[in-house]
Design a protein with these regions (language model features):
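Generic alpha-helical propensity signal that fires on short helical segments
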Residues: 138, 158, 178-182
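Short linear, low-complexity motifs centered on an aromatic residue
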Residues: 150-166
Length: 245
């Protein structure tokens, strides 16, 4: 929905995190192959990027969709650059006694199961023309888990961003899995537009001049959730306060 700048009297941006392990988010993990390929959401994104139907943007630059990425750059962001190792050359030195070595390139394969979360960037706008609050998704980013040297979880970081408005026509062609009724499936566009996903708020523009994520100033996970809920409540209260006058 297009809202003119003059009619947009209130505007906030919100960043959310989707955990694919939550029951409501099971469609994101659906692995079946159908006529148009693998139906897992990360596979759909990668196939659309590889075919040139949508553009991926560098998540290390910003989240404003300014710096396009090549598919090679995406692959390196997901699994790292190939490593060149020096190993014994048993073809020329069968028993290894001569110490003849040769270089070999080791590449890691990308495992779609490693993408366990997604980040959503959205905008909440109050339209004075319709007297309604509207939400529109601006971007989606798959997140990669980062681990410490001892194997413990440290953080997540976006692999790349895709601009959602450009992607909507393509997502309308892919069906999202419905575990409750396989015959009543919806498209991925319908899933996002009807907000059929569970998420938590991880950042907003509300009272945030330093542009910090919640975990940047609140360390306790429970308090982070409460802070995110408070941000949502402030947005909803803006609309309710207008109706109370």
């Amino acid at each position: 929905m297009s809202i003119s700048e003059d009619d947009a009297v209130y505007r906030q941006r919100v960043w959310r995190e989707i955990d694919v392990h939550q029951k409501m988010n099971l469609p994101f993990t659906y692995k079946a192959f159908e006529d148009n390929g693998n139906q897992r959401f990360i596979s759909i994104l990668l196939n659309l990027i590889k075919s040139g139907e949508i553009t991926a943007f560098d998540a290390t630059a910003d989240d404003r969709f300014t710096t396009p990425m090549t598919f090679k750059q995406i692959a390196e962001a997901m699994v790292g650059k190939p490593q060149v190792l020096s190993v014994p050359n048993f073809a020329l030195d069968p028993d290894g006694s001569k110490g003849i070595m040769h270089d070999t390139t080791i590449s890691q394969d990308f495992n779609p199961d490693q993408v366990e979360r997604y980040e959503i960037k959205e905008e909440w706008v109050f339209d004075k023309e319709s007297s309604r609050m509207h939400v529109r998704i601006l971007g989606i980013a798959p997140l990669k888990s980062i681990y410490n040297s001892d194997g413990s979880f440290r953080d997540v970081t976006p692999i790349f961003w895709v601009y959602y408005p450009d992607m909507r026509p393509m997502l309308a062609k892919y069906e999202a899995y419905n575990g409750k009724n396989y015959g009543a499936r919806m498209s991925w566009e319908e899933l996002f537009e009807s907000r059929m996903f569970a998420s938590r708020v991880i950042k907003s523009t509300i009272d945030n001049p330093s542009d910090l994520f919640i975990n940047g100033y609140i360390k306790d996970p429970i308090l982070q959730l409460l802070e995110g809920d408070d941000m949502k409540e402030k947005i909803f209260n803006y609309e309710q306060d207008l109706w109370s006058y």
